[in-house]
Amino acid sequence: MNAQDIIRSIEAEQMKTDLPVIYVGDRVRVGVKIKEGDKERVQPYEGDVIAMRNTGINRTITVRRVFQGVGVERVFLLHSPRIDSIKVIQRGKVRRAKLYYLRDRMGKASRIKPRFDRPL
């Protein structure tokens, strides 16, 4: 057993199996665990998936939303223990793998058309 096999076996133990199918363009709600003092709570973060990286345990999504007129992007490690839940709210119809052009658009120009042929 070489080093690569050992790394893969450790990563396989820590990977989550209950993740939904997520595509670029989807509107998602991510529940993030926040620790404040000795209490822990779940903070929802809702936005559009503008980028994805699919590399095993390092799988990430970049979620963008506009809050008080300012665009905010967060990158979430999907297999992180700090991620409590991920729920797909709406499927989006896009023709690109990365939606970085949405950074330059504001208001109605940054909307993504809904897609109805994929189940939630």
Swiss-Prot record:
The keyword Ribosomal protein applies. One of its GO terms (cellular component) is cytosolic large ribosomal subunit. GO terms for biological process: translation. Keywords: Ribonucleoprotein, Ribosomal protein. SUPFAM superfamilies: Translation proteins SH3-like domain. Coiled coil: none annotated. One of its GO terms (molecular function) is structural constituent of ribosome. The keyword Ribonucleoprotein applies. Belongs to the bacterial ribosomal protein bL19 family. PANTHER family: LARGE RIBOSOMAL SUBUNIT PROTEIN BL19M, RIBOSOMAL PROTEIN L19. This protein is located at the 30S-50S ribosomal subunit interface and may play a role in the structure and function of the aminoacyl-tRNA binding site. NCBIfam families: rplS_bact. This is Large ribosomal subunit protein bL19. The gene is rplS.
